[in-house]
Amino acid sequence: YQGGISLTLMLDPNHVQISPIACPGLLHLAFKHDTTKQFKLLHSKVALLTFKAIESEEQFIRLIVSTGNWTRQTLEDSLDLVWSIDVVPGNKDEQGKADILAAYHYFNDILRHFDTAILTDSGASKLKSYTHTQYARFHKLFDEVVVEDSIKPRFFDNRSASLLDQLPALVKPHCSEKKQDYLSLGPGFYEGGSSDAVPSVINSLHLRLI
């Protein structure tokens, strides 16, 4: 580790700031004070990582989505689900490219609320640091990803509509015409209590999807 930044982190502004000393190589981006917060809670568990070979120009992108917080408690005590894909931009994986591009657009929108000055080469100095170069390379890699309009991404979020409202229409392009009678849910925590009734959220999903 030589002071470079390899990973940036965006958390809800109510979260305690994580210092680079506590986690070398990680930059916990600060929330802008002059921006309008357009969400009640930033609570997505999504990572978009790029990897490059040391001795060649070969690169690939990894998208990770999980149901649990990325903490030691989740790792050691909870039962959670993780979904991930690896995509080489030049390959003919149209579905994978649609997924990573949808996630990239999501991150770009969220980035507007955070201070990224340390990552960009926007000053008067002509010197570019390792961090500037890596950040520019990250965005350039996604600029080269082209997706056909007919391909529907499997990655989606609730910036414009609730997940419950979107789910029925988004599931259809990725399922067969045969009707299904099975629904699997994977949240980090489940509704409890003494009632024998089906929880309201699960019942709503059941009525809309099955």
Language model segments and positions:
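PLD/PLD-like phosphodiesterase catalytic module centered on the HKD motif
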Residues: 1-210
